[in-house]
Amino acid sequence: MSDPRPSQAEKHKLGRAASKFKDPSRAMQSDDYFARKFKAINGSMGPATLNTSSLSEGGGGGGGPANGTPAVPKMGVRARVSEWPPKKDCSKDLACKTLWESRSQSSYESATSIIQNGQNDQVDRQQEEQLDLDFVEAKYTIGDIFVHSPQRGLHPIRQRSNSDITISDIDTEDVLDQHAVNPNTGAALHREYGSTSSIDRQGLSGENVFAMLRGYRIESYDPKVTSSFGFPDFFPCDTAISPSLHAAAQISRGEFVRISGLDYMDGGLLMGRDRDKPFKRRLKSESVETSLFRKLRTVKSEHETFKFTSDLEEGRLDRGIRPWSCQRCFAHYDVQSILFNINEAMATRASVGKRKNITTGASAASQTPVPVGPAGGCESPLGSKEDLNAKENPDADEGDGKSNDLVLSCPYFRNETGGEGDRRIALSRANSASFSSGESCSFESSLSSHCTNAGVSVLEVPRENQPIHREKVKRYIIEHVDLGAYYYRKFFYGKEHQNYFGIDENLGPVAVSIRREKVEDPREKEGSQFNYRVAFRTSELTTLRGAILEDAVPSTARHGTARGLPLKEVLEYVIPELSIPCLRQAANSPKVPEQLLKLDEQGLSFQHKIGILYCKAGQSTEEEMYNNETAGPAFEEFLDLLGQRVRLKGFSKYRAQLDNKTDSTGTHSLYTTYKDFELMFHVSTLLPYMPNNRQQLLRKRHIGNDIVTIVFQEPGALPFTPKNIRSHFQHVFVIVKVHNPCTENVCYSVGVFRSKDVPPFVPPIPKGVTFPRTGVFRDFLLAKGINAENAAHKSEKFRAMATRTRHEYLKDLAENFVTTTTVDTSAKFSFITLGAKKKERVKPRTDAHLFSIGAIMWHVVARYFGQSADIECLLGISNEFIMLIEKESKNVAFNCSCRDVIGWTSGLVSIKIFYERGECILLSSVDNSSEDIREIVQRLVIVTRGCETVEMTLRRNGLGQLGFHVNFEGIVADVEPFGFAWKAGLRQGSRLVEICKVAVATLTHEQMIDLLRTSVTVKVVIIQPHEDGSPRRGCSELCRIPMVEYKLDSEGTPCEYKTPFRRNTTWHRVPTPALQPVSRASPVPGTPDRLQCQPLLQQAQAAIPRSTSFDRKLPDGTRSSPSNQSSSSDPGPGGSGPWRPQVGYDGCPSPLLLEPQGPGSVECDGSGDHEDLMEVGRLPETKWHGPPSKVLSSYKERALQKDGSCKDSPNKLSHIGDKSCSSHSSSNTLSSNTSSNSDDKHFGSGDLMDPELLGLTYIKGASTDSGIDTTPCMPATILGPMHLTGSRSLIHSRAEQWADAADVSGADEDPAKMYTLHGYASAISSSAADGSMGDLSEVSSHSSGSHRSGSPSTHCSKSTGSLDSSKVYIVTHSGGQQVPGAVAKPYHRQGAANKYVIGWKKSEGSPPPEEPEVTECPRIYGEMDIMSTASQHPAVVGDSVPEAQHVLSKDDFLKLMLPDSPLVEEGRRKFSFYGNLSPRRSLYRTLSDESVCSNRRGSSFASSRSSILDQALPNDILFSTTPPYHSTLPPRTHPAPSMGSLRNEFWFSDGSLSDKSKCADPGLMPLPDTAAGLDWSHLVDAARAFEGLDSDEELGLLCHHASYLDQRVASFCTLTDLQHGQELEGAPELSLCVDPTSGKEFMDTPGERSPSTLTGKVNQLELILRQLQTDLRKEKQDKAVLQAEVQHLRQDNMRLQEESQTATAQLRTFTEWFFSTIDKKV
């Protein structure tokens, strides 16, 4: 017998198979690993007999087992693992286990001597030492056990026909040696397969062992024996009591097999988590083992084989097993480039072109599974079951078990029945729902403004394309499209570049394209002038595409020279595994780039064919559907919706293999286009029908070869299952069932079947919805079909086909299109360098790659918050995207735009990235590398506008207050100057992202406030604001991508926005108009009739996706996310969600936005698109040129006609004061008395400032102030105004950033863009009607005043009827109409306010206006609603005076009000619509008994008046500069109210943080000078009122101050109102309605540059108005000219079209005449 101790070189020599051994005994030696374990358990064994059908009997050798009875395994072709060997004594087993787990590197004999109780080893001691050393040198993985690869020198266990041992009988310290013998018997342990072997040796050539294993079926398979592994049945065993599993478990616990993250295995041989390393030498890379096991357990395809190096004694693995890591400095162009793995290409090279066809699609489901029994378990890989069983056991997949009335669960298929959504690994409120059942995921992802994970492709976005991605603007995102395939066409084709082809010995045919280009913006690259673009292609479908900066490449040449670096050095650095000498330069032929284009773009197709099967009632089988000769009316209706019928004969567009010449495939077909795609439908009823052919092969020939099939079911059809279909190609079935066909309420329900290896695709089907018959449903269905086919191409079957094609392309290029020129070396041959020392390469510039445009990649571990797990990912950060790609599934797990990143918290080895509204992802470095985190932070600084977060610990003052306001977004609205929060560094505009370690993104507003109020220690993590004080926001909040997309039907009325579905089938209870969208200015929540439509409203709100974090609580208590108005950047003032059914002013809706509605009519979202609004909103021209009197008076007329419920209730507000009194405690931590207020709110008047109209949030019972500064119980008289004016609105925000954008404000605005003063006044009163002072979440305190994404924007109001909020609109009632008293009655206040009406005239009961306490009045704007009714509707005060509507520029109004304001100094700069679009609304803070300056009661009043213009004019005051600070303290030196004080009040509210920093220490509540004429008793009463004491005196006093201060504002508004009249050039009537005394007193402003008298103001106004009129007149003239030009162009266009048609007809006539003449001559 030959020496059983071969040398290492001999033992591991590559390419040596067992069949080459000359010695027969050696040839039969076992390669099992567990020989010593066998001795311990089984004792000595007798001589083994070769090639017999019986197992050798143990016990013949030196000693018996511990129990004294030799164990005899059962007889048979295979050893029964489940019952062999018998269970040993527990103590003995324990001893074995203890020894095994405590084993160190001791020699083998010391261990085995204990286990075997003195058995004499028959193997030489030196051999044992050698074996043990071998084990120490090479740690064997699970791949060693299962992979047979003779060429690698590794020989795993085989299932033998004749076996003498079982799995558990082998010791794990045995080395993999084909020459090993049984130490006890001397018999060879390695057995060749016996005569009954069913394993075909063709698979053992080393090229692919999994092909052999997958086709192999175990011979004597007992039904009770199941596999304990996740692999095809390699080892049959009984998982219940098998001692084999116990032994294997011990082996695993002893770290024989070390596999990371394995949890799902049956706890036997393969155990889960990582262990400590007991040996010095392990497999070097943990990721190597993970990748290995991942591939093993998924058994994806044959091409995933694993290669080992020949020098295992060094413990090294070949690079084929190690995940390839591209150079960090390489910037990837697209997602699939990040997934490029050159090692996979090496591993799969041998199997390319040899992969078997496997049964997939419907055929896999239709195959009847063959039960596996003892007789049927063994089949050859080449047997009859090859196709079906090539991947795994046919009965292994039972489907997902999901069924409904549309679909039945089916093996090999996965169902989508509704509610499925994209996986979210980020920490947000949305990921609390499960991945598969989260209904919110469905609605969010169906219309999200963000790319879905599968929709992200190109990562490098040019600067000019960054503002808006066109794909996002469209309704549905197309997924699974490799848009990066255009890389060569875009950056190489037609440009100077080099192509190199070759056949690498490891990779096979390869193609490299490389081009040096100058960086377009060197400033971004910090001096780097050039980069190299590289495209590297192998036979794998993934291509390495990207660029590397020249400065990042180590080279022997100088960087930045005109010549550039040697290409060889660039390629060696980027792709070190590539054999550069094999490359040859491509031939100089025009065919080369064309072939490369075909190669790269072979997977791109914009032409799809989709089959349509018609299923009648009671049908379900394929044969029945194919034999439906003609279509029914319901099917015809569906086809008409889906596309257009085309005549096939002569059809020149995409015909999908249909005959367009002889009509052999039918005369007509269905064709349509969607985005860039052409779709031809193979409709079963339009294809030829053969009465005598039951199989209808002419139809099945086309439909059966379509990947995607739509199955249309009539009512009564049976549920569909792919089991009834027989086709290898049909991988996706979209089931569409019609309800109420051929009626107005026709709708469709949808379900989807997809083959199990087809990845999910969007748009997701919302749960429990039906789709109306609209264009939106059509788009949904077409997008679903396109994405289905794209996803199907990701399945294994189609990828294998594409890989073969790609391999042939590359092979052809490498063989037929190359020259003899190799890749250039660094320098040409030079005599000077002969004999010189080799030149060293210059090190690259540090961190140069961080300035690349493409995606830089890091290996990280991401926290999956939805499942509380960690997943290994690849982090890619480009100039546009941040994405995480899961290593295991190779799918994008997360993506967001860099412009949405607002901050990050970086640690030593981890980083938390916050984006959008505080959602976050948590990443940590794989190898605990702090350098990776540093680079990630640097990269974020370069490509985002975020910043590092700051952690603060906030203290409470003596009253338990934190001293700041925070709105529902977590943005700090106000900070008490010099308070604890201010001293800690908290500033206005800061964004709270964590409160007490809880992410704000996961909290509702109420939870956030409760956390701040109740936490003993308040630790917050904040993101500092921008330098201008504006909070950091994601781009999706600021610009709302995509824009609103209206789709007009045939009547020209807009269909619903991007909401293709409703929550339930009650969607169709409304007539056809219900299918139309909510007009932006249309919804009126104040009508009781709307209560009937609440289900519809809830459906509408649910359909609107959310990209903002606000909540809206519906009447039923559910929360909605209304702000993402169809992912709109301009939702307009009209509703962006459901409306509160409660009346605004007890049933009196807003006079501006009312819809015509008859009594008792039902109005739902989208059900009333009204004529006047459509006049404004339907066409832009009408918006620009509609007469203002017609537009706005019609609003007001409808206001009067809409609801008469307010006519009998002049004092209806008397009950509100009681409702507002909820909590009078002043000990709350946030100085809030009414933070969680009364729930019986009334809100939503439908006014322009109605937060529901603004798309703002509604949180029932939550305080906008976050309870930090809210009000005590206040009287109803001042209740409403305080509701709005108690908060500051810092609107300086982001006007500067958009100053150069489109300008829609200015003096030349069209009069159609107007507010009625009544409109925004009623907004205040409507909020007052809410009855809850502290309950202002619906007008939530936005710190920066710009609109929320879903809130009204002004520039897109052409289609919505919204008005321009960049101007102060002062509109009087026109037409001489008598305003009914009912309009004014709701604006009267109970108590003191009812004694007089604020306006230019005051009643006798009003106190004298010279009280200086007016500056402490809590309502500068509070009574503006009364003022507006007095000024606009003189019927309230006296006779109606007909006045025209007028508009005053906002800038001019501010100049009038604030002469010294920076707005004037800046020359009345205009503000872009982006400022108005910004999702930040004005900060509407409730009146507080304790102001932000907690001890100064009155100062909160003064500071809170700021919002008067903000409430009236959302985003009207976008202060783009930092205004000077003006004290909010009452002016103690001015006995009369002054414009200066008014200005101060404005600017304190709107000032930036730098202004606040100049505040003096507030001290106690300021007291006015006694000389001011204020009675001290009144002051005491006021103070008592602040403390929550309810007294008539207090009410009257406060009401008086509020109304008087508002009177001053009213005076200016009315001045503007009067002077802007076209009939009033000079306003001589002013003296008639203005009290000269009062006018003097509150117009006199000592020390101001502006005129100090009313006359001066009038003159100033006259000048302004004349200029405005002049500008307006010029603008109208210009527009008229433009309209005339447009009309001329249209006429010219029509004329040219007619001429073209005439010329065409003449040419046709001439052609016919010509040919007829020729024919006659012939």
From Swiss-Prot:
UniProt KW keywords: Coiled coil, GTPase activation, Phosphoprotein
BP GO terms, sorted: presynaptic signal transduction; regulation of small GTPase mediated signal transduction
Every Rap-GAP domain range: 596-813
Skewed-composition ranges (Gly residues): 57-66
PDZ domain span: 951-1027
Feature: compositional bias, Low complexity: 1091-1103, 1120-1131, 1220-1237, 1328-1355
GO cellular component, one term: postsynaptic density, intracellular component
Biased composition (Basic and acidic residues): 384-403, 1197-1218
Modified residues annotated as Phosphoserine in this record: S149, S380, S384, S1030, S1245, S1461, S1472, S1478, S1488, S1549, S1552, S1591
One term of GO molecular function: GTPase activator activity
Residue segments, region Disordered: 1-29, 45-73, 362-404, 1068-1172, 1197-1246, 1328-1361
Residue ranges of coiled coil: 1652-1712
InterPro entries the UniProt entry points to: PDZ (IPR001478), PDZ_sf (IPR036034), Rap/Ran-GAP_sf (IPR035974), Rap/Ran_GAP_dom (IPR000331), Rap1_Ran_GAP (IPR050989), SIPA1L_C (IPR021818)
Disulfide bond positions: none
Annotated protein name in UniProt: Signal-induced proliferation-associated 1-like protein 2
Lineage: Eukaryota, Metazoa, Chordata, Craniata, Vertebrata
